[in-house]
């Protein structure tokens, strides 16, 4: 049985996408079902919308995030059976909930954890996105540290504030360049206060208040990231990235050590981007 979990999504548009996907599969598979239950239903294949993250006992007790509770239970009880995850796109991301494309992964949603069946792909899907791959930047000024939502599931439980402070301290040992930190818009002022508190005695560190990632990338020498999706924006813009997590989608073409900050690896982007275009599918294709 293939079970689609409607309540794994919060927004009505996302639930509708699951319903549409179910109808498409049901035309070919007699055992495709969809449920509005917030409990795991035994099945051969589970289909959910969105990633899952660890919740505290308090969150479980107060039922603060029923969709995450459901997805955690599915992951736990479903075991090693196939799990299909629909997530936000990797390329051509938009601000807001509705997207033209969605990432579809098997058993996970991150690099080196999920299976996307996208090795050595042709460039056709990438070309349809209308994206430009700028030449690797020969010169740049500042280092851009890419922050993430403090509660982001792609952190896999990592402490983003600790990562930011530790990363900047390491950078200060290896470069004299200005270090800019770009925060996630949903974090409020918490990380800005952390930057001020920890680096008030140096002018080398700056809290970046640019409105867009493109503005932040302007004249950047290199980025440092955990699993931020902005890593892909950076390499498209010609700015190399040093990811500190193997679950970052630019891991395969990048340096992995902050010691390389002055001469970061600039690997082949084209095949990576072609492959990533085959990890996401349009709403029309899913329907």
Language-model features: locations:
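Catalytic donor nucleotide-activated moiety binding site of glycosyltransferases and closely related
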Residues: 5-8, 167-209
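N-terminal pre-catalytic "stem/leader" segment of glycosyltransferase-like enzymes
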Residues: 1-53, 151-152
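Short loop/turn segments at strand-loop or loop-helix junctions that form parts
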Residues: 4-8, 49-52, 86-90, 140-152, ...
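Short, well-ordered secondary-structure micro-motifs within conserved domains or adaptor modules
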Residues: 35-70, 75-76, 223-226
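A donor-sugar binding/catalytic signature common to diverse glycosyltransferases
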Residues: 55, 210-255
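Active-site donor-nucleotide binding/catalytic segment of nucleotide-sugar enzymes
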Residues: 134-189, 273-284
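Leloir-type glycosyltransferase catalytic cores
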Residues: 96-140, 251-287
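Well-ordered, non-membrane alpha-helical segments in soluble/globular domains
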Residues: 14-25, 60-72, 159-170
């Amino acid at each position: 049985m293939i079970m689609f979990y409607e309540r794994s999504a919060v927004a009505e548009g996302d639930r509708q996408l699951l319903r549409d996907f179910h109808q498409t599969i049901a035309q070919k598979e007699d055992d495709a079902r969809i449920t509005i239950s917030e409990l795991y239903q035994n099945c051969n294949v589970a289909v959910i919308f969105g990633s899952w993250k660890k919740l505290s006992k308090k969150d479980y007790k107060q039922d603060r995030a029923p969709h995450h509770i459901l997805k955690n239970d599915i992951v736990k009880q479903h075991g090693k059976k196939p799990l299909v995850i629909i997530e936000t796109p990797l390329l051509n991301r938009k601000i807001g909930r509705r997207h033209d494309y969605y990432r579809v992964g098997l058993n996970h949603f991150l690099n080196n954890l999920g299976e996307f069946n996208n090795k050595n792909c042709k460039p056709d899907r990438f070309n349809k996105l209308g994206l430009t791959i700028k030449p690797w930047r020969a010169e740049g000024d500042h280092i851009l540290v890419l922050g993430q939502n403090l509660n982001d599931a792609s952190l896999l439980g990592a402490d983003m504030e600790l990562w930011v402070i530790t990363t900047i301290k390491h950078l200060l040992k290896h470069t004299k360049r200005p270090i800019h930190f770009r925060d996630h818009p949903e974090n409020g002022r918490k990380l800005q206060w952390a930057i001020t508190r920890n680096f008030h005695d140096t002018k080398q560190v700056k809290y970046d208040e640019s409105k867009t990632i493109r503005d932040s990338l302007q004249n950047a020498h290199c980025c440092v990231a955990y699993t931020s999706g902005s890593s892909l924006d950076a390499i498209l813009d010609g700015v190399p990235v040093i990811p500190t997590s193997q679950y970052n989608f630019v891991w395969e073409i990048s340096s992995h050590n902050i010691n390389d900050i002055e001469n970061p690896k600039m690997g082949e982007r084209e095949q990576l981007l072609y492959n990533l275009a085959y990890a996401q599918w349009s709403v029309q294709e899913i329907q």
